[in-house]
Amino acid sequence: MVNSKTVVSALALSALAAAAPAPSSTTSFSINQVAVKKPAIHPAVKYAKALAKYHAEIPSNVASAAASAQSGSATNKPTADDEEYVTPITAGSSTLHLDFDTGSADLWTYSASTRGVGSHSTYDTSTGKKVSGASWQISYGDGSSASGVVYKDKVVVGGVTASSQAVEVATQVSSEFSQDTSNDGLLGLAFSSINTVSPTPQKTFYDNVKSSLAKPVFAVTLKHQAPGTYDFGFIDKSKYKGSLAYTNVDNSQGFWQFTADGYSIGGSGGGSSFSAIADTGTTLVLLDDSIVDEYYSQVQGAQNDSSQGGYVFDCSADLPDFGVQIGDYTAVIPGKYINYASTGSTCFGGIQSNSGIGFSILGDVFLKSQYVVFDGDNLQLGFAAQA
């Protein structure tokens, strides 16, 4: 049976192929996200997943709220968001919907033989060449894990081909992954130094195609409640206002990590600097406790609710904007974006604690307000407000 996701991706890929430039030594392209239906997921589940990704200690109240939601025993059921946005690619002959993740460096997906594959679309391994002796494994503090083998195959994203891309194929996955039907795996866009393939780490798609791009950059335009785009090889001035504010990247841990020069709440500045990671693979914004507490002190009725796993408030509450200072530029998250999701009787905040991991995570709640340029050659990030 052909599902709607397959039809959408086939149409999207054919349209992209028609619009894409012919491959050359220097090229550029855009690829659009597509919408897929997703089940209702309590925001505490996503919060726990984000902490686990960075091996942070998951507070007991967050773990409890997430477990209750996943077991179906939660008192308050979340309202289902209609859609989630993923990006279509081809690996060999297979069309896959992947989550493009600037917080990891593995391209991994499912095959028909994956234990726990569920309803995911799968990669046809017959088109690839298995890498002898290579394996990979990821495991997180929330108990989720995946592991498998590695193939080399042609991977096409938009108008550019990586002719020998490592495709990490899961042989087994935990229930946390198999039950998440919103994507068919990840395409990591962090630095190749944190790729998990053993004994020899593999290059990311970006590193493999970077030399063929007109400019060695990619840019991200995520959207609030709408599909976004990823631009490779060029900067699209029509997608942002004013000038890009650049800041240096510290990639020593393999992430797109930088120092924010301060923060503001409701337009009032003065907050101290903090280290942060730009991460398209994390939904929420995770900050130091002191900043989180300061923010919600400005929201009438907000409370850190242990039963919900984080800060909640009345859904009609007026939330202040949150600003991240980058040089002379303030990247502003509109307050309405921070009203992340309903838990039934209250709404869950898009800003939550980073559980003391030593840096902040600026996930989609932040990125959906910005046009962000990722420049791996010059080790810098550029930010501007979306047009």
From Swiss-Prot:
Keywords: Aspartyl protease, Disulfide bond, Glycoprotein, Hydrolase, Protease, Secreted, Signal, Zymogen. Residues 85-384 form the Peptidase A1 domain. The keyword Signal applies. The keyword Coiled coil does not apply. It catalyses: Hydrolysis of proteins with broad specificity similar to that of pepsin A, preferring hydrophobic residues at P1 and P1', but also cleaving 20-Gly-|-Glu-21 in the B chain of insulin. Clots milk, and activates trypsinogen. Disulfide bonds join 315-347. SUPFAM superfamilies: Acid proteases. Residues 1-19 form the signal peptide. GO terms for molecular function: aspartic-type endopeptidase activity. Residues 20-66 form a propeptide. Pfam families: Asp (PF00026). One of its GO terms (biological process) is proteolysis. Its EC number is 3.4.23.20. Belongs to the peptidase A1 family. This is Penicillopepsin-1.
